[in-house]
Amino acid sequence: MDREELLRTITTSHRELAQLAERISDDRLRDPAMGDWKGKDVLAHLAWWHDQSVLVIEGLRAGRQPYDETDPANTTDGFNERVHREHLDDRPDVTRVAFNQSFERLQAAIRPLTDDDLFGADRWPWLGGEALVEMLLWDTSRHYAAHLEHLAPLAQNART
């Protein structure tokens, strides 16, 4: 895989989920999708992870630590809980737009990266020996696959 293939992979995955989201009415996006999360909350969550990836890329490229990993609030669960709380009142149309616009920002952040930036396991010490591409795949295509099962039923079953 190189940068162009990465961009094709995540863009294809994003397009598929964005098309699914377009088939879900705003009313259905207000329905439960995952525990106490509504469909719109899942889209807001995915958008936040896109933007988080952008912040990590920007921090790494600037030579700074993107965030303090030792802070107990900066865990995956901590981030997810905070994002859910902060976006509870977002309208479905807002989360749909955020999902798409945040992905555009992520694509723009990836484009100037070299293959070494993306695939070099030792390129960014802050990532603890993991290549940046792994984080990007988990924050995009792999993440979409994990939430597809939560959103797909909202597109299939019309509210009566």
Describe the predicted segments one by one.
Residues 1-16:
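Extreme N-terminal tail/first-helix region
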Residues 2, 39, 80-95, 126-134:
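Acidic/His metal-coordination segments adjacent to aromatic residues that form catalytic metal sites
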Residues 2, 48, 52, 90-91, ...:
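Alpha-helical structural elements of signaling/regulatory helical domains
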Residues 3-6, 68-69, 107-110:
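A broad, low-specificity signal for short, low-complexity segments enriched in glycine/proline
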Residues 8, 29-78, 118-160:
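Short, contiguous alpha-helical
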Residues 14-22, 50-58, 100-114, 145-148, ...:
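Structural signal for well-ordered, non-membrane alpha-helices
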Residues 24-26:
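Extracellular-facing binding/remodeling surfaces
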Residues 76-119:
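Acidic/histidine-rich alpha-helical segments that form the ligand environment
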